[in-house]
């Protein structure tokens, strides 16, 4: 048993050291979970060689970290990774009990240690959503021979003033999605965005969408 565990640990170290360079494996985020799965011998097969016999078990073992850590066990699709880098993908969620007064108190004045507080106009925050709305409206009109249009009571009609701002907080270091959610809840944030390179953004109560779509974590940019 001891020999098997030692072999798995050695395999883990070799795997992480090689894949972190070739496939941008996030060792800081994935090492613990990948180690557990390798020690249990749940991720030993190689899909690249046509053997995916362990893929389901490995996916279940990594759970919510599968998408971020599958490259550490050689199971990600290289083509999809190159087409959509981790910094271009993110997970967002609304928090159930935001505390706007707490979030404002923590983000006014000097920024909390190891964070970046960023304030952006709502127009900038909503730019992508606005472009998407215009595209969908055009598509809708085309499909209906320009006889109907999407209703204009969209979210943007209420936010055309330039004085409204959206405040977000980035953490300097890479964190897991669970930590990101916990940190943002403890700050009183209303939402969070967790980029798939492990950069965390807490989103304030004035933000209408999900904050900025740019990675700005000082020590977690790639």
From Swiss-Prot:
It is found in: Secreted. Residues 1-24 form the signal peptide. GO terms for biological process: blood vessel development; determination of ventral identity; embryonic hemopoiesis; positive regulation of BMP signaling pathway; regulation of angiogenesis; regulation of BMP signaling pathway. Its main location: secreted. GO terms for cellular component: extracellular space. Pfam families: Tsg, Tsg_N. Disruption phenotype: Morpholino knockdown in embryos exhibits variable outcome. It may result in a weak ventralized phenotype or in dorsalization. Keywords: Developmental protein, Glycoprotein, Secreted, Signal. Expressed uniformly in early embryos. Glycans are attached at residues 51, 145-146. Belongs to the twisted gastrulation protein family. PANTHER family: TWISTED GASTRULATION PROTEIN HOMOLOG 1-A-RELATED. Involved in dorsal-ventral patterning. Appears to function predominantly as a ventralizing factor, through its actions as a BMP signaling agonist, acting through both chd-dependent and chd-independent mechanisms. May also antagonize BMP signaling, probably via formation of ternary complexes with chd and BMPs, resulting in dorsalization. This is Twisted gastrulation protein homolog 1-B.
């Amino acid at each position: 048993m001891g020999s098997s565990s030692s072999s798995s640990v050695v395999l883990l170290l070799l795997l992480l050291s090689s894949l972190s360079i070739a496939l941008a494996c996030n060792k800081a985020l994935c090492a613990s979970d990948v180690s557990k799965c390798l020690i249990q011998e749940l991720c030993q097969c190689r899909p690249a060689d046509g053997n995916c016999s362990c893929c389901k078990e490995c996916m279940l073992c990594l759970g919510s970290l599968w998408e971020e850590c599958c490259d550490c066990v050689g199971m990600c699709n290289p083509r999809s990774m190159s087409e959509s880098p981790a910094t271009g993908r993110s997970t967002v969620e609304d928090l159930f009990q935001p505390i706007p007064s707490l979030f404002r108190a923590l983000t006014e004045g000097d920024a909390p240690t190891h964070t970046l507080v960023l304030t952006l106009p709502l127009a900038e925050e909503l730019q992508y959503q606005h472009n998407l709305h215009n595209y969908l409206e055009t598509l809708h009109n085309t499909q209906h021979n320009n006889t109907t249009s999407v209703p204009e009571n969209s979210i943007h009609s209420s936010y055309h003033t330039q004085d409204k701002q959206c405040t977000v907080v980035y953490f300097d270091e890479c964190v897991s999605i669970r930590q990101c959610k916990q940190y943002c809840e403890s700050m009183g944030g209303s939402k969070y965005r967790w980029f798939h390179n492990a950069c965390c953004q807490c989103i304030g109560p004035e933000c209408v969408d999900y904050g900025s779509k740019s990675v700005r974590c000082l020590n977690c940019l790639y």
